[in-house]
Amino acid sequence: MSAEASPETGRFRTKSSPELFFPATDSEGEEQNDVPLTIVHPTQSTSSKFSINIASSSRPQHGITTGDFEATSQTSAHDNVDDDFSIVGHNPASSHPQGTIVAPRRKRSLQQAHSHHSSSSSSPVPSAPVIRADFRKGFLGEFVCEGWSLSKGRGYCSPGTKIVIERPKSKSTDVGAPKPGRKDSGPVRLVNGKVVGGVKSKQMTLGSMMAKKVEPAKKVKATTDQIIRFRNERGFEIGRLSIHEAGFLAHLLDTGVIQLSGNVIDCPQNLTTGCTILLNIKVYLARKAFENFGKHKREEHFSFWKDQRETAMEEAMRLRKDSLRSLFERIGVKPIQSSALSKVTPIQGVLNRQKGPDLEGSRLRSSPSTSTAEEKGKGRAAMPAVDDDGEDSGDEAEKLDEKQMNEIDSIYRKAQQGDTRLDEMDPPSTFLYTLRPYQKQALTWMNAREKGDSSVRNESLHPLWEEYLFKKDQLPGEPIEISDDDEQPDSTRKFYWNPYSGELSLKFPTSQNLSRGGILADAMGMGKTCMMASLIHTNREEKPAGNLESQTRDGVEGEIDEEPASKRIKFKQVTLSNQWRAVPTAPKVESFPRATLVVCPVSLAAQWHDELRKMSQQGSINSYVWYGGDRVDIEALLAGDGKERVDVIVTSYGTLTSEYQKWLRTKDRPNYEGGSLYDHEFLRIVLDEAHNIRNRLAMVSKACYELKGQRRWALTGTPIVNRLEDLYSLLHFLRITPWGNYSFFRSFVTVPFLNQDHKALNVVQYILESCLLRREKTMRDKDGRLIVDLPPKTVEIKVLQFSRAERQIYKFLEERAKKRFIDLDADGRAMSNYTSILAMLMKLRQCVDHPLLVLGKSGEDGELGEKILESGAGNGEGNLRDMIAMYAGGIRAETPEDVDKAYAAKVLKELGEQEDTPICELCSNEMFDEVLLPCYHRSCQDCIVEWIGTCEDQNKIASCPSCGKGPIKLADLRSVQRRHKRVNPITDAYPGGRDPNLKSSNDTTVTLGKVDLVTSTKLRALLRQLEEIRQEDPKAKALVFSQFTSFLDLIEATLTKQGIRWLRFDGTMSQAQRANTIEEFGRKTNEPLILLISLKAGGVGLNLTMANYVFLMDTWWNEAIEQQAIDRVHRLGQNKPVYVTRYIIKGTVEKRIMKIQRSKTALVNASLSNGAKTKETTLADIKKIFGMDEEDSEGEVY
């Protein structure tokens, strides 16, 4: 037992003596080791003999001593930039008393000095932190909490006693540190020719050189404690704060963010260990809280697995953010101004949410470096397989469901509310077209975005920040001031907090963005190309725009932070050959950009070129299509002047990707001389159909990201296809900070939205309002008129019945597919065989179009689909392939020579003399697809085939319905074929269009042939309707869409046989052939013309207003894709009524797909084509498609 001075009298008594500045051990099992405390300068107290004051941006120097005190530098366990001392209750800017140690302040680095030119890759702070010179600390507020006594006896404290709050420093334990027995004789140095100093080691031998080197031991971070002790002004320890408060105060004290002071409110006169002491704690934000935090960029390029780790800096930011949030909630601090996001839905700041999104919410918390190889393998397997050229990315579970897509639609509508109030702007006289009012408004908005005009939008608070006020610190004895709510707060008392990253600022953080451009997301068919062309005419300035690209490029994403190859110093080997080579005399490209680069799908390249030529005064705008393997040198193209000047370069996504891959291979070579598209800066970059880059990991997206341009535009009718991260890719291309940073977008938008946080909708709405303009055809202007006045559109759904033979084939195929699905589902293997199920559904959809399509392979799923064709039903019905062969038995059509010539001559004479269209005896309508019976009576082909099948089902002899003669077999039927002169003028790739016997367009020949049963129900319906259109409008033009090019081949052969002129547009054609096809289709004609077009190649972007009839031959999973196809015709420039016909077969998979679409439970956005939602919803939808959940209603009205 040692003697102790009594706190009251100073006398000694037999008890362990509490030492000044050092903690006494308590009896609650706390750490028994002597832990040196941080040297503390008490607030409002002069009892301390000296204090330590460390400059805010420097570290303590090693070995600085004064008197008997030695300050040694030590790295904090929480953050490698922490100071060695937590200054608690100390004023950093106060005068330094005698004995104070002040470490020298280091100069700011060049990167910090210029940090206001680029936004951080980790947080959207304003410019470099601006801290007023007179700012010392700001009073945040006070709260009442409990403390637990660690002392026994009287005189330690009483109500009103001031207390000093202190924290022990955490220690780092170096496992590999030198043992105590090994002497360290100071730094290594040369003395009298000998090396002395350092830790002595053994002599180096050959064995030790060859021995395996031991990896240096890593520093083990000591367990983080949350003990906060408090003492009286005389230095006697009293107790510690409760765990609840210490949990969030400890980290803030350790990092110097806050300073604490307090006093005792109530306590027992005689303290006992563990008794409760009621305290009042005052909290101040220290000057260090507003210094630059978390701004250090990664010093190395991390691999994928390392990139998933939470770095030490990210951990420190997360702890700081969570601790500040808890502190603000404990004190009751409320923001006086929230961001624009909070204004949409009034909330009590971000503090009221249970838990905000982490800055790196998407990162894995576990370090892969400590995991086993097996765990790493599993991690890789869990990652989605991404193809560079694929359209899908990310987790399939993040696809938006129907409810979420409806929420996105509501966000669009809210973002459109102010669009009708935009001013109208006329384009220059060089633009020949007349813009509609809503297009003039778009020109106003786009021009302001490119000019960077801040007057269009008031300067507002950054969306991630909130504004707060420091409170007035009431000193004891001062009168209590009552603040007036209407009183304008003093600007020096304002501070700002980012609740997402935990950063604090004394400067107003604005939402200004250096990005020049945006997203023009008007609905399809509203003239986005025309509006962009007017902008090209309006803004053609030829002045250097400064280093805008470098200002915005750095803060978007770490993926592209590398210095462009064109700016790096290039070294060339000096050789004799290159010293004597010819000197190029071609003019160099001017130092400032002037050309616009348009990137679009290959099918739209020629259309962009033609539209620009039509809309521009001759010689005002020169455009060039840069496409194909024989592309001209881009440098020479941009260097042209006068008549050779090129203002707009049009290229395709495929060409750009090819150029990008070539540039990546060559840009780092020593002999690289430039000349790539990526070595030049453009005045403007325009992405048409910009949703093509929605996969941020695809090569085409990276190719677009890397382009250099002062202004960037994305044109798309669907900014969000099926994931919120589709929008991120556009923002990243546009260089819009901070949303173009993947970590921020995922943390603040994607994750909260998927977690059904309604505030995430406000974030998305704010983003869209700031950079997106979207109008729809149904919108009205300020006067209540529709902004787009288009002709009416009529959509007709024709529900058809299968023929008897087609029904048998389909039912057989459906039963086989359904049985396999039931077996897989019963075994629990349905989702693991998901691709096989999709292949079965593909075969069913093909069979609905035409049974012959089932015989062909369908891409990657062909082999899986082929298994369905094999026998194995076990019911004696034979092989499906045999059934289709029997159905197609009439495909070998006989020539006219195969028919009896006398019989043919007699019938042809009668047909040639007949002028009126005959009436069918079975349907009482005009005959379609005339068929001649052996008794010379005629009928519709569908009617007589159905009649013969019905008789066979009833075991009756089929006879003529007119005269009763029989029996009649299908082989006895003859078709009546009338052929008109039709040719295809595009290429020789489409044969069979000309009949040498026809000499004029009005010539018609009548022939007899065997009935061609290969024409399916849909084909016959299409031919019948085309024949009706030909009679009503001899100059009609129509589009026939199908997603199966093999079905287009059958339609092509059928049209050729019927003498109907057609053109073809699909993905197998070159860009030149596509352009020629569209040009030919747009020419005037005196006869009907049909364009056979694949849904994928021609469903988006094309302007085909020269047609007004649309036929959709099959049903797609996503109805929006079909609407896009219809909008190729129903768009600006259409002056005729549009008629749309959709063909479906009753009682088949098509009907059920439409029912799912109608009931709003569809597999949204092609989840059946290359993805899945949750397991339960996917299986439920597949069962609906197979017709397993309910009876198929044949009498349903569509």
From Swiss-Prot:
This is DNA repair protein RAD5. It is found in: Cytoplasm; Nucleus. It comes from Cryptococcus neoformans var. neoformans serotype D (strain JEC21 / ATCC MYA-565). Residues 386-395 have a biased composition (Acidic residues). Residues 45-58, 118-129 have a biased composition (Low complexity). The keyword DNA-binding applies. ATP binds at D522, A523, M524, G525, M526, G527, K528, T529. The lineage of its organism: Eukaryota, Fungi, Dikarya, Basidiomycota, Agaricomycotina. Probable helicase, member of the UBC2/RAD6 epistasis group. Functions with DNA repair protein RAD18 in error-free postreplication DNA repair. Involved in the maintenance of wild-type rates of instability of simple repetitive sequences such as poly(GT) repeats. Seems to be involved in maintaining a balance which acts in favor of error-prone non-homologous joining during DNA double-strand breaks repairs. Keywords: ATP-binding, Cytoplasm, DNA damage, DNA repair, DNA-binding, Helicase, Hydrolase, Metal-binding, Nucleotide-binding, Nucleus, Zinc, Zinc-finger. GO terms for molecular function: ATP binding; ATP-dependent activity, acting on DNA; DNA binding; helicase activity; hydrolase activity, acting on acid anhydrides, in phosphorus-containing anhydrides; zinc ion binding. Residues 104-117 have a biased composition (Basic residues).
